[in-house]
């Protein structure tokens, strides 16, 4: 056994816990600082983590900030500036840049006929503006002045080219009047199968109760005279869509159905599309602009319905996928061609 190993043997039976219990708090803190794993070569670590904490030392004296600043300022003034390697002599080298003078092109003297000279000399600013527009000098005026002079047979720019352009005064367009349809009376006429009632238009009536719309769809099942049924912007949801689907399975006289701009989800649209397959009289279907996008599965179902239902010749929906859009366009072209051939017979 070597001497080094013999030296280590006497430390094997030492009780480390007993030694730690006899250390003071200051000694324990110093021991903890010594045992910290530091990596001074790791440049990715901050400086405080690459070395031991050295800021807990007691101050060597009082700190006087003003005296320290005064000392630093005095030291900076007393330090002699370093001399230049090559002294500056003030000599200017090279030639200064002088902007070359540009020659102003001489304007060509244009001689006009005496009649034109006299007419132009006595023309007003408004007439000069119209003449410039006729000659195509649109860079001298605004677009409004140019098109007013070209399109109007009279002098429109009465103040000349440099005048302030006034905007056109458009006539106010009033809002469309509300839908005057009486829902209760409409429901009675549908239930009584009125011969004169061929269109049910409830567009933009947003306070219709759901039970009333459900009763209207229920009455449409046995109606044989209504050709168009429109529920645009009525805040209809999936319950109304299911009622419309049940109506389509039994009604055999309806030709146009419009349920655009509502709150129908993909489930409600899928129910309507499945019911359209069982209806052979419907020629127009519009389901666009719902509150949420129906999804790829619904768009594929729309294309399949159009392919399987040759009676539909008008379909209102903006496809977002190329595949269903191409299939639907091909199906609509085929359906319209079949309708045209039937009319020729």
UniProtKB/Swiss-Prot annotation:
InterPro entries the UniProt entry points to: LRR_dom_sf (IPR032675), TMOD (IPR004934)
GO biological process: pointed-end actin filament capping
Record keywords: Actin-binding, Cytoplasm, Cytoskeleton
Basic and acidic residues composition-biased segments: 336-345
Major subcellular location class: cytoplasm
Cellular compartment(s): Cytoplasm, Cytoskeleton
GO cellular component, one term: striated muscle thin filament
Spans annotated as Disordered: 40-64, 326-345
Any one Gene Ontology molecular-function term assigned to this protein's record: tropomyosin binding
Signal peptide (residue range): none
Pfam families according to UniProt: Tropomodulin
Record's function text: Blocks the elongation and depolymerization of the actin filaments at the pointed end. The Tmod/TM complex contributes to the formation of the short actin protofilament, which in turn defines the geometry of the membrane skeleton.
Family note: Belongs to the tropomodulin family.
Assembly and oligomerization: Binds to the N-terminus of tropomyosin and to actin.
This protein's name: Tropomodulin-4
Organism whose genome encodes this protein: Mus musculus (Mouse)
Gene designation per UniProt: Tmod4
